[in-house]
Amino acid sequence: MKYVLFGAGLQGTAMAFDLLKHARGTTSVVAVDANPDALSALSAKLDDPRLTTVAGDVSDPALTAPLLAGADVALSAVNYWFNDDLAGLAIAAGAHFLDLGGNNDVVAREFARSDEARDRGVAVVPDCGLAPGLAGILGYHLATGLERCRSLKLRVGGLPARPLPPMNYKVVFSVQGLINEYVEPALVIRDGQVRTIPSLTELETLRFPEPFGELEAFQTSGGISTLPQTLEGRVDNLDYKTIRYKGHCAQFRLLNELGLCDAGPRSFSGGAVSPREMLAAVMQEKLDLPGPDVVLLLAEAEGWDEDGRPVRRSIRIIDHADQENGISAMMRMTGYPAAIIARMLAAGDVTRRGTLNQELVVPADAMIAELRRRQVDVQEFSGDPGEPA
């Protein structure tokens, strides 16, 4: 099975690691990135003859189109704004395509390519990481396992293993993607209908086992991809919130209210700068902190079973960094699900064609089994909603 991987950063490294170390049947991985240093680091880390690296601009069709010829699956681990064009190139080459998504407008453009992909006999699957991605797959699995679902709550966070100043946070994935999640509107289902609400709102507290204890969660954008449309009319209420150590939401809300998340350029002393780009650069510098990270996930569905009895079903994941192999928890929980889906596409386990909702075509049981094979502790619970969680 032949894969082309766009991006050799943190998540691209995790995807390549998984395809070469865990996925069955991989014959080649071609990694493309504009940064030669990132490619050199990838080659040194993996030390696998099946890996080939190519330095260049992923947005250049003259570079990427020949690389896609003969590939089974193309995976995008670059910033979300590249994904629609890369999907088009993969479709033209007859290769399946998936990405880590995270931006609703870009994903909508990928869905506009569905007929094009179907005609070429390929699948395009956006939003295949942690959230969006795994969270939606697990949430759909829980909700549809009930006769009627009253509430589906998805809570996910990538955090330092212990809170670190100045924001009780460390960079664990793209800073641009993080800011996008914090400022774009969030999709929810309220009273059976899809609605949008502002991000950085509806702050709540929740508890995880020690040493984490009481944490906070708040609305953010893009974490559940197409799940609201898929479950509209089938679930009374659905929302997704990002988990952080307490106090983080108020800090970032202040930055946003001051205009530091605005994308448009501002003029200063004869020059112009985008506040968002400046903020991203500063965050990358100041929040690229040492120490391991952790990923926390809680998916919880409440409703009634086929006998009309109230029931709560939940899945909890607490995943830690693989320090032996230098793979962070966020890399594991973002890159591994994407690589698992890529292998499903290459093996023919996903038979539908066109642009696809990952929650409808990726079997949750198979995903959970593959994650457990990678030593991810996926815990499943079921009980009466009146019982303690």
Can you annotate each of these PLM segments?
Residues 62, 73-90, 105-106:
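Beta-loop-alpha module in the N-terminal Rossmann-like domain of NAD(P)-dependent dehydrogenases
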